[in-house]
């Protein structure tokens, strides 16, 4: 039986052996509490037929737990200094592939086609670097990858925004974007004390299970998200004011925008954070002909 990597003693041994120093610019914080890793893997509900994509494996603490449960693990690591460490710590596992590439620049669709030829389902499981959490998640969602979902650790504040409900302070355009594609649920809070080095923020684990179809049906997704972003442009302003100020030539189309709100059954004095995703969809459909009739 191999010793878990994610203990203070074992992590220190590995880092000292390789003279590794953390790069703040890469948001490197390594977990040193194996029980938390076990729970993350449990939340992912892996089987012996599951393929896993990991982002930022670090020294392999989560990777080894995934390798023990999944059919195959493919991990993207941007820091070249970690490659020899991973080759060492993960040497007992024949079902792990490390790809030295920035996930944001990678053709993940192609990687899936090449690496996961014999799996029943695919999950993304990762302790994400906090400085690029949102871009990574949005890339994985908008690329329409054939994944079942994600279980990822990230900054608690970001997890709160992704899983927020309408009318709360955390509810915003990120909430809508994530919940358009997935069912989002915060499944665990993680204190900053279980990492080295200790981050300045607390963490949370969020589970995003992909919807078979988006949460709402819209004519144009780009325009739908433009309306959502416009509605949250200035949180203290009404939805009408935000649409007038944030949409192209909005002020020139004031009467049409007011009519669109009326047709959607939305009080123009409401604020964006009070609208449910279905209301944004209805509003987007009413506004779409106004802004695309000349397009």
From Swiss-Prot:
GO terms for cellular component: cytosol. InterPro entries: KsgA/Erm, rRNA_Ade_diMease-like_C, rRNA_Ade_Mease_Trfase_CS, rRNA_Ade_methylase_Trfase_N, rRNA_adenine_dimethylase, SAM-dependent_MTases_sf. The keyword rRNA processing applies. S-adenosyl-L-methionine binds at residues 29, 31, 56, 77, 102, 127. It is found in: Cytoplasm. Its EC number is 2.1.1.182. It is an enzyme of class 2 (transferase). One of its GO terms (molecular function) is 16S rRNA (adenine(1518)-N(6)/adenine(1519)-N(6))-dimethyltransferase activity. The keyword Thylakoid does not apply. Specifically dimethylates two adjacent adenosines (A1518 and A1519) in the loop of a conserved hairpin near the 3'-end of 16S rRNA in the 30S particle. May play a critical role in biogenesis of 30S subunits. Belongs to the class I-like SAM-binding methyltransferase superfamily. rRNA adenine N(6)-methyltransferase family. RsmA subfamily. This is Ribosomal RNA small subunit methyltransferase A. The lineage of its organism: Bacteria, Bacillati, Bacillota, Bacilli, Bacillales. The gene is rsmA.
């Amino acid at each position: 039986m191999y010793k878990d990597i994610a203990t203070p003693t074992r992590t220190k041994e590995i880092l000292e052996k390789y003279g590794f120093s953390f790069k703040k610019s890469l948001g490197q914080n390594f977990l040193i509490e194996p029980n938390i890793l076990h729970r993350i893997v449990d939340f992912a509900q892996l089987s012996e037929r599951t393929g896993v994509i990991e982002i930022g494996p670090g020294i392999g603490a989560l990777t080894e737990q995934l390798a023990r449960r999944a059919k195959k693990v493919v991990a993207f690591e941007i820091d070249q200094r970690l490659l020899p460490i991973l080759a060492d710590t993960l040497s007992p596992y024949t079902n792990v592939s490390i790809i030295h590439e920035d996930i944001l620049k990678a053709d993940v669709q192609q990687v899936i086609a090449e690496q996961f030829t014999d799996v029943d389902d695919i999950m993304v499981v990762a302790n994400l670097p906090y400085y690029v959490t949102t871009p990574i998640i949005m890339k994985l969602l908008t690329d329409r990858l054939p994944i079942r979902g994600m279980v990822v650790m990230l900054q608690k504040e970001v997890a709160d925004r992704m899983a927020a409900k309408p009318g709360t302070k955390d509810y915003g355009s990120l909430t809508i974007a994530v919940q358009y594609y997935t069912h989002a649920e915060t499944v665990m809070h993680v204190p900053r004390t279980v990492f080295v080095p200790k981050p300045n923020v607390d963490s949370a684990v969020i589970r995003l299970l992909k919807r078979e179809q988006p949460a709402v049906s819209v004519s144009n997704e780009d325009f739908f998200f433009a309306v959502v972003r416009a509605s949250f442009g200035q949180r203290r302003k009404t939805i009408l004011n935000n649409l007038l100020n944030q949409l192209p030539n909005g002020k020139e189309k004031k009467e049409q925008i007011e009519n669109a709100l009326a047709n959607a059954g939305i009080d123009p004095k409401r604020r964006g954070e009070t609208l449910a995703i279905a209301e944004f969809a209805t509003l987007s459909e009413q506004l779409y002909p106004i802004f695309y009739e000349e397009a």
